[in-house]
Amino acid sequence: MDHTLHLHVPFESARLADIAARALAPDPLLRPEELSVSFASDGASLNIKLAAIDARVLRVATNSIFEALKTVVETADELDF
C-alpha cells in the first residue's frame, strides 16, 4: 500500500497505553484490502501504524482512530485509571 502513517501517542503510564491498544484493536476492518492498521503499546506510548491504498482512505481511517482514541482517553479519565 502506497500511503502510510505511523503515530506515537504518549500516555501517563504503560498501563494506560496497553489499555488503549487493547481497546482499539478489536474493531474489524471493513475493507482489509484497502487498509491495514496495527496497535501496539511500547512502554508509556501507543504506536499506531496505518497503511492504505490512497490518501482518502488513510485520512478517513486516521480521523476514525482519533475519535476512538479520544473516547478511550476520556473514559480512562472518568474512571481515574
Swiss-Prot record:
GO terms for cellular component: chromosome, telomeric region; EKC/KEOPS complex; nucleus. It is found in: Nucleus; Chromosome, Telomere. InterPro entries: CTAG/Pcc1. Keywords: Activator, Chromosome, Nucleus, Telomere, Transcription, Transcription regulation, tRNA processing. GO terms for biological process: tRNA processing; tRNA threonylcarbamoyladenosine metabolic process. The keyword tRNA processing applies. Disulfide bonds: none annotated. Its main location: nucleus. Component of the EKC/KEOPS complex composed of at least BUD32, CGI121, GON7, KAE1 and PCC1; the whole complex dimerizes. Belongs to the CTAG/PCC1 family. Component of the EKC/KEOPS complex that is required for the formation of a threonylcarbamoyl group on adenosine at position 37 (t(6)A37) in tRNAs that read codons beginning with adenine. The complex is probably involved in the transfer of the threonylcarbamoyl moiety of threonylcarbamoyl-AMP (TC-AMP) to the N6 group of A37. PCC1 functions as a dimerization module for the complex. The EKC/KEOPS complex also promotes both telomere uncapping and telomere elongation. The complex is required for efficient recruitment of transcriptional coactivators. This is EKC/KEOPS complex subunit PCC1. It comes from Eremothecium gossypii (strain ATCC 10895 / CBS 109.51 / FGSC 9923 / NRRL Y-1056). The gene is PCC1.
